[in-house]
C-alpha cells in the first residue's frame, strides 16, 4: 500500500490513474463526458439491488422523513454554530444574496468602511485634534468631512443592498403548493422545508431538490428543461418509482405518505445521486433519474409531486453557485497602496519638521532669543519637537485626501446611472434596460483582458433552423444574401394542414419537387427524417407537439413535417407518419441510438409492403466510411457539405440500406444477445451496430443553423480588436461548442485547433524541460522560458470537462485505501511525507501554470462539458497566474459561480431565469451590448477615474505642501498658512465640483469613435493612465505648484509698501493671497485637463471661484465676527488685501507661472508624441466619415474544409432505450400487484427503527 501512496506523485506529467486517485466528493467525475445510458428502469434496479446495496447504506447519512417537520427537531440533527448555540443542519429554502439587515447594517457597514486605511486614519486624527497641546486647527475641520464621507458611502451601500433584497424577495416569494394539514395549500418558496410534499405544475420552476413521487404521465415520467443547470434547452425525462407513482396520486394519499429517505449529504454533483427510500417495510433504490433539481422547469407534464430532499443553500445548484465575494477594482487596490505611500511621506515630512522644531527651540526658542514667544510651559526642546510632530501630522493631514473616497463613490454612482439610462443598451422586445447592479466596479470595465462566456442563451438564441439541404446532388435553400435582397419568396405551406406555422424556408423548387412526386430520392429523404429519430409526439389541445432529445433533432422532424412527411405517433414497436396526406405505420425492428462515439443513429423498420430497410443519419466523417463503393453523388454531396460548413451550418448525412429477411434474422439474434449482456453491454451493442451499418446508399445531407444572438460575430470581432481574449465555457457537447466557435468567428480554417491529447504533449514537454533545468541541464532553459506555440499562426484550444479535471482539481485517494495508509511514526517518515506533499503541490501548480500559459497564447479557448464549479476554477486559474482582469458573462444558474469568481460578472436577463442576473454586477438582454459596456462605458469610466485621481492628488499636494514651505519661516511651530475655514471648505466647495464633473462627463472621443477604434481600449488593459509613475508625476506637479504659490507671494510681500503707505505683508493678507492664487490655479488646471466641454463644466469652474470669493468676503466681514468672535478671526482681511492692485498682480503672476509651463508641455506632447486618442481627436471629423467602413468586419470565409465536427447532434443519448422499454407509450396505469412484481430484486424487508 505504501507503494501506491508514493506512486501518486512519481510521474505527475502523466494522466492520473482514476482507479487509484479518483475525484473527491466535491469534484466532477470522469463520467461527465461519457455517454449516459438510459437503460430501462428495471434493468438498473436489479443491478443496484445486487451490487450497490451495501455501500448505499454506509454512505447515506442524510435522512428525510415525509410530512413530519418535528422529525428534524431531534438533537442529532443539530449542528453547533457558535459556542453552545446550535441550529438545524437542514437549511431553509430562502436564498440570500444581500449583505445587511436592519440590525447589522450600521456596525457591519462602519466596519467595512473603517477597513479603508484613509477612513481609519482620519478617525485617529479626529481623536488627536481633541488634544489642545498638539492641535493647531479645530476638530471640525476633520469631523465634518469624515461624517460626510461615511454618510454618503453608507447611503450608497444601503441602496445597493435594498436592490438585492428586492431580487431575493422576488425569488423567495414565488408561489408553490405544499401539503399542509392534509391538503395542498399555496405557500411561498421561502416557507418550504425539507420533508415537505409539493406539487409542481407545468412550466413552473422546481423550488428545491425533490424526489419525484408521481406525475400526471401514466408512465410515471416527468419532462424537465435544465437550461439553468447545464445550459441545454432540450428536454430530459425523469422517472419516479412505479410503486410511488401508483399509490401517491391523490391528495389524501400524498398527505398520508410517511416514507423515510436516506441519501448522500448535500453536494455539488449535478449528475449523481445515491439514496434509498424506506416505506411500508420495503426499501427502494434511488438515483439521479428520480431527482428534480432546483432551477429545472417542468415541461409537457401537467403536474408532478415530489418530496423535498435539499432546500435553499443545500440544493445542488446553490452548492455550485459559490460564495458572494467582495469585489474591488485594481484602482481601489492601487489607491490604497498610494494612500500608504502618502502616509509614509506624511510621517517623514512631520518627523523632519519636528526635528527642525527641536533645533530651533534649542537655538532660537523662548528660552534663548525669542523670549516673547514664551507660553508658560517649561518644556524641553525635544519634548516640544515631539509635540510638533503630532501637530504637523494634523496640519499636513490633507495630504491624505479624506474626500477622495466619497468623491470616487459619487463618480461611480453617476457612471452607473449613465449605464442604466443608455437607450442603445435597451432591448425593447422584452422591455429590458441595461442595469448596473453595483456601483463600485465601473472603471474596471475599461481594463478587461479576458472574457469567459457561456454559450447557450448567451451567444445563441437556442433556436435551431432547417436552413438548407442537398438531395441526390442538388442543393436546396437560398443564401442569406439573396434573402436580404428580397430575391426569393418564403415557401407557402398552407396546403399542409399539419405544418408548423413558425417554420420558414426559402426555395419553392424543393416543394415543387416533393408535390410532383417524380424524384424518388426526395421522397426517401424526407421519409427518413420522419422515421429516423427518437422524438416523441403528443397532442395538446389538438395541436401536435414534439419532444426531442436535442433541438437539432426536433428541427429535422419539424422540417419533414412541413414538407408533408409528418411524424404522428409511435408505440414500443411501431411508428406512424403521414406521407403527403397518406397515413402509414411502420414496424420498428430496432433503434440503433446515437452516442458521442458513434456520431450517428439508425432505425430498422419493416415497411407496409414487407421490405426491411435501415435508415441512418450522422456526421459525414463516419457516414462516408460506411457507404457502398458505388455512390455517384458522393462528390456532389461533399461539395455541398463544404459550402454548408463554410456558412457554419450544422450538417448531417442521410443514407439508407435494404436488408433481406435472412440477414436481418441473423443480425437480430446477435442484437438481442448484446442487449441483455450483463457486462460491457454498450461495447457489445456498438459492435453489433457496426456489423449492420455498412454498404449504405447516400441520399444527401441537411444543414441546420444554430441561431446566434444578433451581432454576436461583430461584437466578438470588435472585442478581439481591443486585444480582449474570449473563452467559451459551456456544459454542451464538444461538437456543438466547436460549431458555435466557427459561427461566431472565434474559429476559422486558418486556426490550428489543439485538443486534449495535443495539450498533454505540450505540457509534458514543458515539464520535462523544467525538470532538466532543475537538474542542471542548461540546454532546456531557453525552451522552458519560451513560448509553447509559434506566433506565425493562430491557435485555439478545445478541451472537455473530464480533461480539465487533470488541471483544476485536487485529487484524493479513495477512503477505503486511505484507511490502509501507514501513519508516519518517526521524524524521518514525517519529513518524507511532508516532502512528498510539497512536491505534489508544486508539480500540480507547475502543471496548472503551464496550462494557463499555453491557453493564453491561443486566440480562443473553448471548454465544453464543464460543470459550474469548473467554470469558476478556469476563471480563477487565469486570475491567479496571469493577474489579468477577467469578465464572466452568462444567463443561467449554472453560470453563477463563474460570474461571482470573475472580477466583473455580467448576467444576460430574460433567457433562463433571474439567478445569473441576481448574482451579477451588470445585466442586460443581449450579448451584443457587451461591446458598448466595455468599449464605451468601461473605457470612459476608466479614463475619467484616472484623470480624476491624478488631478485630485495634484490639488491636494499643491494645497498641503504650502504648509511645509511655510514652516521654515515660522519657527516650525505647526502654524497653518490658511485660515481654518478655508482648510475645511477647500475640498468640499472650492475645488470639488469641477473635478467631479470631469469624472462624470469627460470623454476624449465620442461613443461612435470608441466603437470604431477598439485599440483605444488597450491603455486601460496596460494600466497606462494611472500607476505609480503617474502618481509621482502628480506629486512632483503638486510640489512645483506649491513652491510657486508660496514663494512668489512671499517674495512679493517682502519689504513691500501698499498704496496707503501701510505694509500689506501681514500674515492674514498673505493667507488670503496664497489661498486665492491656489483656488484659481487648481480650477484653471482642471480646465486644461478637460477634453469634453459643456456649459456645466465651464459654470462649475468659474462658479467655484465665485463661491470662494463670496464665502471669503462673508467670513471676513465684521458682522459675522461680532456674532462668533472666536470662530471668525480674519475680520476685514480679504477686503483690505484685495483692494491692493499689487496683490492682484501677484496673484495673476502666480497663476501664470503655474499654468503656462503645463500648456507648453501639453502642446509639445500632442505635437511630437501624440497618443492614438490624440490622433483621433485631431482628425475626428474625417474619422467619423469612415466609421462605418472601418467598423465592419471582413466577410467570413472558412474556405473548403475537409473536416467537419459540426454535425447536428447536441445530446448525449436519445430516447431509444425508453422507447424500447415501452414506458414512453401512453397506457393505462398498472395494477399494484403488477408494480410489485417488477421489483423482485429491489424490494427487501425492512423494519423502520424508531
Swiss-Prot record:
Binding locations of Mg(2+): 454, 456, 891, 895
Sequence positions that bind ATP = 454-456, 553, 594, 617, 650, 730-732, 865, 871, 894-895
Cytoplasmic-side segments = 1-133, 360-385, 978-980, 1056-1069, 1114-1117, 1162-1250
Q: Which reaction does it catalyse?
A: ATP + H2O + phospholipidSide 1 = ADP + phosphate + phospholipidSide 2; a 1,2-diacyl-sn-glycero-3-phospho-L-serine(out) + ATP + H2O = a 1,2-diacyl-sn-glycero-3-phospho-L-serine(in) + ADP + phosphate + H(+)
Question: Which residues are catalytic?
Answer: 454 (4-aspartylphosphate intermediate)
Molecular functions (GO terms): ATP binding; ATP hydrolysis activity; magnesium ion binding; phosphatidylserine flippase activity; phosphatidylserine floppase activity
Membrane topology listed for this record: Multi-pass membrane protein
Give the chief site where it resides. membrane
The leader peptide range reads none
Q: Which Pfam families match?
A: Cation_ATPase, E1-E2_ATPase, PhoLip_ATPase_C, PhoLip_ATPase_N
Q: Where is the composition biased (Acidic residues)?
A: 1-13, 24-40
Q: Which residues cross the membrane?
A: 134-154, 339-359, 386-406, 957-977, 981-1001, 1035-1055, 1070-1090, 1093-1113, 1118-1138, 1141-1161
Quote the cellular component terms of the Gene Ontology held in the record.
apical plasma membrane; endoplasmic reticulum; Golgi apparatus; phospholipid-translocating ATPase complex; stereocilium
Stretches the record annotates as Disordered: 1-52
Mapped to this chain, the residue ranges on the Exoplasmic loop side of the membrane are: 155-338, 407-956, 1002-1034, 1091-1092, 1139-1140
Q: Does the keyword Transmembrane apply?
A: yes
Q: In its UniProt record, which GO terms are filed under biological process?
A: apical protein localization; regulation of chloride transport
**Subcellular location, record wording:** Cell membrane; Apical cell membrane; Cell projection, Stereocilium; Endoplasmic reticulum
* InterPro entries, sorted: ATPase_P-typ_cyto_dom_N, ATPase_P-typ_P_site, ATPase_P-typ_TM_dom_sf, ATPase_P-typ_transduc_dom_A_sf, HAD-like_sf, HAD_sf, P-type_ATPase_IV, P-type_ATPase_N
Which family would the database say this protein is a member of?
Answer: Belongs to the cation transport ATPase (P-type) (TC 3.A.3) family. Type IV subfamily.
Protein name according to UniProt: Phospholipid-transporting ATPase IC
Taxonomy of the source species: Eukaryota, Metazoa, Chordata, Craniata, Vertebrata
Amino acid at each position: 500500500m505504501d507503494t501506491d501512496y508514493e506512486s501518486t506523485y512519481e510521474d505527475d506529467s502523466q494522466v492520473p490513474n482514476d482507479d487509484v486517485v479518483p475525484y473527491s466528493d466535491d469534484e466532477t467525475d470522469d463520467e461527465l463526458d461519457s455517454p449516459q445510458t438510459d437503460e430501462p428502469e428495471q434493468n438498473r434496479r436489479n443491478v443496484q439491488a445486487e451490487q450497490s446495496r451495501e455501500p448505499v447504506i454506509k454512505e447515506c447519512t442524510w435522512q428525510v422523513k415525509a410530512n413530519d417537520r418535528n422529525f428534524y427537531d431531534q438533537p442529532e440533527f443539530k449542528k453547533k454554530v457558535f459556542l453552545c448555540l446550535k441550529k438545524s443542519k437542514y437549511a431553509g429554502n430562502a436564498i440570500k444574496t444581500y449583505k445587511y439587515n436592519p440590525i447589522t447594517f450600521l456596525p457591519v457597514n462602519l466596519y467595512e468602511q473603517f477597513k479603508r486605511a484613509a477612513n481609519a486614519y482620519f478617525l485617529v486624527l479626529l481623536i488627536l485634534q481633541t488634544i489642545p497641546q498638539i492641535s493647531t486647527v479645530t476638530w471640525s475641520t476633520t469631523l465634518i468631512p469624515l461624517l460626510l464621507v461615511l454618510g454618503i458611502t453608507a447611503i450608497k451601500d444601503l441602496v445597493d443592498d435594498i436592490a438585492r433584497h428586492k431580487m431575493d424577495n422576488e425569488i423567495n416569494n414565488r408561489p408553490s403548493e405544499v401539503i399542509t394539514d392534509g391538503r395542498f395549500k399555496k405557500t411561498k418558496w421561502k416557507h418550504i422545508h425539507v420533508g415537505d410534499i409539493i406539487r409542481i405544475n407545468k412550466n413552473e420552476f422546481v423550488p428545491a431538490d425533490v424526489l419525484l413521487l408521481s406525475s400526471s404521465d401514466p408512465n410515471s415520467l416527468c419532462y424537465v428543461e435544465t437550461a439553468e443547470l447545464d445550459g441545454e434547452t432540450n428536454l430530459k425525462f425523469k422517472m419516479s418509482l412505479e410503486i410511488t407513482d401508483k399509490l401517491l396520486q391523490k391528495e389524501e394519499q400524498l398527505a398520508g405518505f410517511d416514507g423515510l429517505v436516506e441519501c448522500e449529504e448535500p453536494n455539488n454533483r449535478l449528475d449523481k445521486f445515491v439514496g434509498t427510500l424506506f416505506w411500508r417495510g420495503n426499501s427502494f433504490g434511488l438515483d439521479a433519474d428520480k431527482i428534480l433539481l432546483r432551477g429545472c422547469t417542468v415541461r409537457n407534464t401537467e403536474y408532478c409531486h415530489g418530496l423535498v430532499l435539499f432546500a435553499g443553500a443545500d440544493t445542488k445548484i446553490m452548492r455550485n453557485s459559490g460564495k458572494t465575494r467582495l469585489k474591488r477594482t485594481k484602482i481601489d487596490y492601487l489607491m490604497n497602496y498610494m494612500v500608504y505611500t502618502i502616509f509614509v511621506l506624511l510621517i517623514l515630512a512631520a518627523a523632519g519638521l519636528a526635528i527642525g522644531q527641536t533645533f530651533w527651540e534649542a537655538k532660537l526658542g523662548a528660552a534663548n532669543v525669542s523670549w516673547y514667544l514664551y507660553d508658560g510651559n517649561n518644556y524641553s526642546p525635544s519634548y516640544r519637537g515631539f509635540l510638533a510632530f503630532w501637530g504637523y501630522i494634523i496640519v499636513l493631514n490633507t495630504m491624505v485626501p479624506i474626500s477622495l473616497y466619497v468623491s470616487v463613490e459619487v463618480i461611480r454612482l453617476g457612471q452607473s446611472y449613465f449605464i442604466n439610462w443608455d437607450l442603445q443598451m435597451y432591448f425593447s422586445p422584452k422591455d429590458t434596460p441595461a442595469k448596473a447592479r453595483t456601483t463600485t466596479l465601473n472603471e474596471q470595465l475599461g481594463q478587461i483582458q479576458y472574457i469567459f462566456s457561456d454559450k447557450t442563451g448567451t451567444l445563441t438564441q437556442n433556436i435551431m433552423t432547417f436552413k438548407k439541404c442537398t438531395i441526390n446532388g442538388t442543393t436546396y435553400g437560398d443564401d442569406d444574401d439573396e434573402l436580404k435582397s428580397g430575391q426569393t419568396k418564403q415557401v407557402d405551406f398552407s396546403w399542409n394542414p399539419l405544418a408548423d406555422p413558425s417554420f420558414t424556408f426559402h426555395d419553392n423548387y424543393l416543394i415543387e419537387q416533393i408535390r410532383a412526386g417524380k424524384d424518388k430520392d426526395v421522397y426517401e429523404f424526407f421519409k427518413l427524417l420522419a422515421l429516423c429519430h427518437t422524438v416523441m409526439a403528443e397532442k395538446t389541445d389538438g395541436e401536435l407537439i414534439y419532444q426531442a432529445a436535442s433541438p437539432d433533432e426536433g428541427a429535422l422532424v419539424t422540417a419533414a413535417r412541413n414538407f408533408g412527411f409528418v411524424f404522428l405517433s409511435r408505440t414500443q414497436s411501431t411508428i406512424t407518419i403521414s406521407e403527403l396526406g397518406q397515413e402509414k405505420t411502420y414496424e420498428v425492428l430496432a433503434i440503433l441510438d446515437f452516442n458521442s462515439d458513434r456520431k450517428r443513429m439508425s432505425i430498422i423498420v419493416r415497411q407496409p409492403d414487407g421490405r426491411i430497410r435501415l435508415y441512418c443519419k450522422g456526421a459525414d466523417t463516419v457516414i462516408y466510411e460506411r457507404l457502398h463503393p458505388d455512390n455517384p453523388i458522393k462528390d456532389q454531396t461533399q461539395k455541398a457539405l463544404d459550402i454548408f460548413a463554410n456558412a457554419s451550418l450544422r450538417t448531417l448525412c442521410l443514407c439508407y440500406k435494404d436488408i433481406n429477411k435472412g440477414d436481418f434474422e441473423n443480425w437480430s439474434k446477435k442484437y438481442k444477445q448484446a442487449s441483455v449482456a450483463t457486462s460491457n453491454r454498450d461495447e457489445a451493442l456498438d459492435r453489433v451496430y457496426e456489423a449492420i451499418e455498412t454498404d449504405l446508399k447516400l441520399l444527401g445531407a441537411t444543414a441546420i443553423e444554430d441561431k446566434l444572438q444578433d451581432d454576436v460575430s461583430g461584437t466578438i470581432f470588435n472585442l478581439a480588436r481591443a486585444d480582449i481574449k474570449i473563452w467559451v465555457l459551456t456544459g454542451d457537447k464538444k461538437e456543438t461548442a466547436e460549431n458555435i466557435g466557427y459561427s461566431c468567428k472565434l474559429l476559422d480554417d486558418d486556426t490550428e485547433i489543439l485538443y486534449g491529447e495535443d495539450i498533454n504533449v505540450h505540457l509534458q514537454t514543458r515539464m520535462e524541460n523544467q525538470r532538466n533545468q532543475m537538474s542542471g541541464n542548461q540546454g532546456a532553459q531557453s525552451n522552458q522560458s519560451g513560448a509553447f506555440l509559434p506566433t506565425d499562426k493562430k491557435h485555439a484550444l478545445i478541451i472537455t470537462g473530464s480533461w480539465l479535471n487533470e488541471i483544476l482539481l485536487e485529487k484524493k485517494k479513495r477512503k477505503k485505501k486511505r484507511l490502509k495508509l501507514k501513519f508516519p511514526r518517526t521524524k524521518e517518515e514525517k519529513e518524507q511525507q511532508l516532502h512528498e506533499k510539497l512536491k505534489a503541490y508544486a508539480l500540480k501548480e507547475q502543471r496548472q501554470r503551464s496550462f494557463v500559459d499555453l491557453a493564453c497564447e491561443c486566440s480562443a479557448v473553448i471548454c465544453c462539458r464543464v460543470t459550474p464549479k469548473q467554470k469558476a476554477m478556469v476563471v480563477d486559474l487565469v486570475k491567479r497566474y496571469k493577474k489579468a482582469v477577467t469578465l464572466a458573462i452568462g444567463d443561467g444558474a449554472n453560470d453563477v459561480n463563474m460570474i461571482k469568481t470573475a472580477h466583473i460578472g455580467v448576467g444576460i436577463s430574460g433567457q433562463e431565469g433571474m439567478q445569473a442576473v441576481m448574482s451579477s454586477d451588470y445585466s442586460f438582454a443581449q450579448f451584443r451590448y457587451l461591446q458598448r459596456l466595455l468599449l464605451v462605458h468601461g473605457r470612459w469610466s476608466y479614463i475619467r477615474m484616472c484623470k480624476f485621481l491624478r488631478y485630485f492628488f495634484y490639488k491636494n499636494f499643491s494645497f498641503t505642501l504650502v504648509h511645509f514651505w511655510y514652516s521654515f519661516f515660522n519657527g516650525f511651530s505647526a502654524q497653518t498658512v490658511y485660515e481654518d475655514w478655508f482648510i475645511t471648505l477647500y475640498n468640499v466647495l472650492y475645488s470639488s465640483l469641477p473635478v467631479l464633473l470631469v469624472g462624470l462627463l469627460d470623454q476624449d472621443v465620442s461613443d461612435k469613435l470608441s466603437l470604431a477604434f477598439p485599440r483605444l481600449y488597450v491603455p486601460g488593459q496596460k494600466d497606462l493612465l494611472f500607476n505609480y509613475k503617474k502618481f509621482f508625476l502628480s506629486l512632483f506637479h503638486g510640489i512645483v505648484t506649491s513652491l510657486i504659490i508660496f514663494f512668489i507671494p512671499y517674495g512679493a510681500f517682502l519689504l513691500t509698501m501698499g498704496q496707503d503707505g501701510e505694509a500689506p505683508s501681514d500674515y492674514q493678507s498673505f493667507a488670503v493671497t496664497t489661498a486665492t492664487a491656489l483656488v484659481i490655479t487648481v480650477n484653471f488646471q482642471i480646465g486644461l485637463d478637460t477634453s469634453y466641454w459643456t456649459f456645466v463644466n465651464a459654470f462649475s469652474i468659474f462658479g467655484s471661484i465665485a463661491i470662494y470669493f463670496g464665502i471669503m468676503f462673508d467670513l471676513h466681514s465684521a458682522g459675522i465676527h461680532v456674532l462668533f468672535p472666536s470662530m471668525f478671526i480674519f475680520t476685514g482681511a480679504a477686503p483690505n488685501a484685495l483692494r491692493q492692485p499689487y496683490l492682484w498682480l501677484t496673484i495673476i503672476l502666480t497663476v501664470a507661472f503655474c499654468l503656462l509651463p503645463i500648456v507648453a508641455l501639453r502642446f509639445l506632447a500632442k505635437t511630437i508624441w501624440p497618443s492614438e486618442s490624440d490622433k483621433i481627436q485631431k482628425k475626428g471629423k474625417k474619422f467619423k466619415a469612415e466609421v462605418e467602413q472601418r467598423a465592419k468586419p471582413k466577410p467570413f470565409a472558412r474556405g473548403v474544409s475537409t473536416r467537419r465536427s459540426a454535425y447536428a447532434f447536441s445530446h448525449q443519448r436519445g430516447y431509444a432505450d425508453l422507447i424500447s422499454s415501452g414506458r414512453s407509450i401512453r397506457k393505462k396505469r398498472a395494477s399494484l400487484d403488477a408494480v410489485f412484481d417488477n421489483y423482485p430484486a429491489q424490494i427487501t424487508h425492512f423494519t423502520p427503527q424508531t
